[in-house]
Curated annotation (Swiss-Prot):
Residues covered by the DMA domain: 314-349
Cellular compartments annotated: Nucleus
PROSITE patterns tied to this protein: DM_1, DM_2
UniProt keywords, alphabetically: DNA-binding, Metal-binding, Nucleus, Zinc
A GO term from the CC aspect: chromatin
Native source organism of the sequence: Homo sapiens (Human)
Function statement: May be involved in sexual development.
Principal place of residence: nucleus
Chain segments annotated as transmembrane: none
Segments of the chain annotated as binding DNA: 70-117
Protein name: Doublesex- and mab-3-related transcription factor A2
Keyword flag Repeat: no
Pfam families: DM, DMA, DMRT5_DMB
Location of region: Disordered: 201-316
Amino acid sequence: MELRSELPSVPGAATAAAATATGPPVASVASVAAAAAAAASLPVSVAGGLLRGPPLLLRAAEKYPRTPKCARCRNHGVVSALKGHKRYCRWKDCLCAKCTLIAERQRVMAAQVALRRQQAQEENEARELQLLYGTAEGLALAAANGIIPPRPAYEVFGSVCAADGGGPGAGAPAGTGGGAAGAGGSEAKLQKFDLFPKTLLQAGRPGSPLPPPVKPLSPDGADSGPGTSSPEVRPGSGSENGDGESFSGSPLARASKEAGGSCPGSAGPGGGGEEDSPGSASPLGSESGSEADKEEGEAAPAPGLGGGSGPRQRTPLDILTRVFPGHRRGVLELVLQGCGGDVVQAIEQVLNHHRGGLAAGLGPAAPPDKAAVGAAAAADDAWPSRVDAAAAAAAAAGGPGLPAPLQAGPAAPPHHRPLLAGAMAPGALGSLSSRSAFSPLQPNASHFGADAGAYPLGAPLGLSPLRLAYSAAAAHSRGLAFMAPYSTAGLVPTLGFRPPMDYAFSDLMRDRSAAAAAAVHKEPTYGGGLYGPMVNGAPEKQ
């Protein structure tokens, strides 16, 4: 068709075309011959143009194919082949705008090529691991073991880490302000989880309440510094266990306050001016405050112990204070001294007493009436005189004096004294008639049926040497040897083991009927407190 469109421009082609169109079919042979003659008479350039294909298909057939040229040289008007030219280029260090743009493009292209190579390599390794281990669980296991770097497709544990580490106030140590909460949280999370670090850089939730700053343990505030907090926490702790309570309401703070008021070495200005509220004692299983508060309380030295500024190991007294937060520190210290520093034996003594008090139905949970509270206040006022009388009686009997925590003096205020049921003059002891298997040891001469001056060895206690030896041999496993350092008047702890007279067979089957009858007749009995809440007919405060 293209050939026919260009033929009329040639001389003689019009007549041949007319003859072909108007002539009969016999004359077609002559017309074909005429067209061939006309084509033979065309110039060579026109014939080549008619037979040439599209230029796009003929580009690869050029004599010299296109070779890469140096872009820097092209910017400066010089054409030079790139092969072997990069090192010797005249403008390789040129800093003009065009050369700088070329260098930036080269850097971006190199980074893209490296990234594509790395992605292709990771995909190949992931495909091989999927064939070896199976589904995405195998990929997650390989990512956790460090075989392949963690990618978003493999982080199946990322949500778990975020849920555990992103709790309200989980990373902020109690003792830091709001500005340092994010840094403390990231450090704590990086200590806990190290498999997927990039998911652990976030701090706690923005709407979570932060624990308030820690109050000092004593009024002078010289016991702990700001750098003694420990950021180690457990997952799930923090403000979930007690976000509104500060460290001053925890059992450790109460124990430290009581130690500052009752121990002789800790008396100072303002050391005995604080009084413990009876409603602040928490049960053993639900201690107030968070774990971070407890760790900070352990790291801060107690004011009565005079520790250093760094973290210290727990002393036996601290262990007893944590195990029994409802008891006073001075009382636990006396129990520990009586057990020779053995923490296990001291815990057994306190637990035996608690078990005996619960079985007897006279547990410490029974609230006293108003008259009993008034009698307790009167007993508190008269306590130093009773201690002085007990010390004088012990000195007259020739026995050892009072222990250091029990000596009356200006360092020990009355409301921080340890509660000893026998810390009184021997003449003030009445006839106590509780003789069941769960009754505490009674330091009463009339109870054992012996004269007070019969034997010089046990004169203050009214114990004969025979019965004392028998009771020590028979009840050593139940803690009767605890009497040894306190063999003076009024210093025998009333723990929950049986008195020596109750080892007779006639008394083994007795119950609390005698105690009930004594309660009806208003006879003074020992209750279920650690050292007996009844002294001279007045219940003492626990």
